[in-house]
Amino acid sequence: MNPHAGIRDNAGATRNGPMFAASCIAFVATAMIFAIRSDILGDLSTQFHLTKAQLGWVILGAFWGFTITVFVGGQLCDLVGMRALVGLAFLGHVAGLLMTIFANGYTMFAAGTLLIGFADGFLEAVVNPLVSTIYPDRKTEKLNALHAWWPGGAVMGSVLAYALTKADQPWQVKQAVALVPVLVYGFMFLRLRLPRTERVQSGISTRRMYQEALKPFFILWFACMWLTAATELGPNQWIAEILKHTATKSGILVLAWITLTMAVGRLFAGPVVRKLSPIGLLAASAAASGAGLLALSYAHSAPTAYAASFVFAVGVCYFWPTMLGVTSERFPVGGAFLLGLMGAAGNASAGLAQPLMGFFYDTYGPARALRYVAVLPGLLVLVFGGLFMRDLAKGGYKVVKLGGQEPPPQGRA
């Protein structure tokens, strides 16, 4: 056995636990920042005299900052090591939050938002290949479990933001709350020794890693990531603000409901993945998310908003982690690079969706802004449905293993 692969032996479960736990807390931190920012959009617009479209461009900085660093970090992960990238993420989160809290103008606010985006990207560049490496036979399942803590953290952030609003606390206090999980994940990772990635352990060359990105199936998969991310993260950053004007003044609680539903769905993704296959799950998710968005655009009361948001949440909850899981299972030669590339695509898409959402909001009103996004999951139903049928015709979904036998096909008819 490779001396660096000790994390895969029977004793590995004990060593894997702290690494997985630290990764989960890191996701809680990024999600709390996201959720609290959703709650304070109106305050930020007033504080810095911004239109909704201008605010969307500032938020775009967070997504594009993520895009740059998750792409670069996916390649640096094997060169400088995971620990160094976690350190950069921690410093970026602390500095970005402090800049936002003490911003004295638009420029400082925008710079702090961008820095938080950089930190989010470095963190994502580490935790996805880390979990894929320590759980090589359960990638999609464990990535879903990991990413359950993103909506879990968003629930925490949403509820805390709501409570602080009721307590008449300023937006700066709400933003400062996110420093707590940042400090916790920084301390947890500081005490850990992180492994080399699965690709490096398997002796796959860097050249082969880059060549994997040129496969036609991966190019299609890369394109799908743009659509899934825009469907999920485009509306989610705005949904609390939109529903305040269309359905319920407590829009942030609807966001909490969405993220709670997503967390539960991801935690129990394992049986669903084994029953449908990852691609079958994505096809069903696309149909549900499209229906949910349309229903949300017609919701005019709290009960209808909660019902529609449940359908939307069930649809989008599996998108991000399952897209990464399939990338790691079908293109393992691409290693951290392809996972970083997918993360970059997702956040570039989600970032571009922000000013578009702001434009549609300003021009057509809040409800119709959601209606425009519903076109995207409609396209995904066609793509994922076709891929699912192709897999069935070939005997089911198959995982590509590095240096081992393929497990039984999933999702067979």
PLM feature segments, named:
Residues 68-107:
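Conserved MFS/SLC helix-loop-helix module at the cytosolic interface between two early adjacent transmembrane helices
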Residues 69-81, 265-278, 361:
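Helix-to-loop junctions at the C-terminal end of transmembrane segments
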Residues 18-50, 235-240, 353-357:
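Extracytoplasmic
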Residues 112-148:
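Cytoplasmic helix-loop-helix junction between adjacent transmembrane helices
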Residues 137-138, 145-197:
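Helix-loop-helix hairpin linking two adjacent transmembrane segments in secondary transporters
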Residues 35, 62-71, 155, 259-267, ...:
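Residue-level signature of mid-helix packing/kink "hotspots" within the transmembrane helices
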Residues 49, 81, 102-107, 136, ...:
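Helix-breaking motifs and short loop linkers at transmembrane-helix boundaries and internal kinks
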Residues 37-39, 214-263, 353-354, 358:
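Extracytoplasmic gate region of multi-pass secondary transporters
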